[in-house]
Amino acid sequence: VLDYPKLKDAVVTHNHPSGGSFSVDDIKFLKRVPISELRVVSERGSYYIRRPKEWPQEINSSVKIENTIKDIKKELRPKYQKMYNKKEINKVERHQMFSDAVIRLFAERYGLDYGQEIHG
């Protein structure tokens, strides 16, 4: 069991071997635990997302976060599926690009600091 008070203002890093950005569970963790930043590392690079000073009303609970991300996925999925169907991208690229686009749009809409750092 995590000792949440000890994580206050910490930067928590974990890996995503698939190369994708943050999951819904990652965002809910950022909301639930008093860390300042969450990072995910893959062989291509890393993503970061920083908690806002105050969570907007629209995403101030786990259920609201889940529903919001579900709606964003529904909005963006056709674009990436179309690229995949036209063989412009492969399955791995589709996953990586789609997951990044979903969290990028989520962050832009709700004022979270999000970005990617490419390695090497």
Predicted regions, residues:
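Divalent-metal-activated hydrolytic enzyme cores
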Residues: I35-G120
